[in-house]
Regions:
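Contiguous beta-strand/loop segments that form the cofactor/metal-binding neighborhood of enzyme cores
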Residues: 137-221
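Hydrophobic residues in well-ordered beta-strands that form the structural core
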Residues: 51-52, 76-78, 213
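Predominantly a Rossmann-like dinucleotide-binding segment in NAD(P)-dependent oxidoreductases
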Residues: 84-158, 164-167
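Short strand-turn motif at the edge of the Rossmann-like AdoMet-binding core
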Residues: 53-54, 79-82, 110
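Beta-loop-alpha module in the N-terminal Rossmann-like domain of NAD(P)-dependent dehydrogenases
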Residues: 9-68
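Rossmann-fold dehydrogenase core element
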Residues: 64-82, 102-106
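N-terminal Rossmann-like dinucleotide-binding module
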Residues: 1-6
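C-terminal glycine/acidic-rich active-site capping loop/insertion
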Residues: 81, 201-244
Length: 244
């Protein structure tokens, strides 16, 4: 059978048929190669669409797709999860309102457990040319929320460690030093680990204090804690795991 109905959910094995139905919003969670095809197919239907990053396997192709989406006035959004996270938005307000003064510097350390890489499985997720790898899957999240919090950045220098398997040259560790026009210096480290929960920590040093936003969890986005260190006071806020 081509489709199975469970209450109000219809599972369709031909994605093109979905566009012919009375659906207002399409949400994609597919590999970049297929995602590019689906987004282009939607040019004729112009349905609102939410997609993952990277948009396609190549940066130039992704740029062209974004340009066409704007020209065709198709409502679209890339799923940059952290920009909609309750505590990331709380942190942005604290920075904008200068509750602890001006930001002096910050660091990001994100260690994660890559299942495909650790098991030496050759998939698009371990192949940077197919839109996978640390740079495309993880580092893009970090750069996007750093721009959201601190403004546009430029990379000063980077350090990369590689691991080779099944003909792939996999970046298992990336460290980047960044700076922005306001002279806010940042150090970003993203790397694969073999065991344990993923560990994601953002540390920010201000003129009048220090803030740490962190989680140690199986889930990328859940159980974050915001700790605000001001003069003689520490305030702790736990995430409600809510998104805009």
């Amino acid at each position: 059978k081509n489709k199975f109905q469970i209450r109000n959910i219809i599972l369709e094995n031909n994605w093109k048929k979905v566009f012919k139905k009375k659906i207002n919003l399409i949400i994609l969670a597919v590999p970049p190669k297929l995602q590019e095809k689906i987004i282009k197919y939607n040019f004729r239907y112009k349905k609102k669409i939410i997609f993952e990053k990277p948009i396609s396997q190549q940066y130039t192709k992704s740029e062209k797709i974004v340009k066409l989406l704007k020209e065709k006035k198709i409502k679209s959004e890339i799923n940059l999860t952290y920009l909609n996270h309750d505590l990331f938005n709380k942190l942005k307000l604290l920075i904008l309102r200068k509750k602890l003064g001006r930001v002096k510097r910050y660091s990001v350390v994100w260690s994660f457990k890559g299942i495909d890489f650790n098991n030496r499985i050759k998939t698009w997720k371990t192949d940077e040319k197919q839109g996978g790898g640390i740079k495309n899957i993880f580092l893009t999240h970090v750069f996007s929320y750093c721009e959201f919090l601190f403004g546009s950045n430029r990379i000063i220098k980077s350090k990369i460690k590689y691991s080779k398997f099944k003909g792939l040259k996999y970046k298992k560790f990336i460290s980047s030093d960044v700076n922005n026009p306001d002279n806010i210096y940042g150090k970003i480290s993203v790397f694969n680990k073999k065991t344990g929960f993923q560990n994601h920590k953002i540390s920010i040093w201000f003129e009048k204090g220090y803030i740490k936003l962190f989680t140690k969890s199986k889930d990328w986005t859940k159980d974050f804690i915001l700790k605000i260190h001001s003069k003689n006071k520490i305030t702790t806020i736990k995430s409600k795991n809510k998104f805009k």
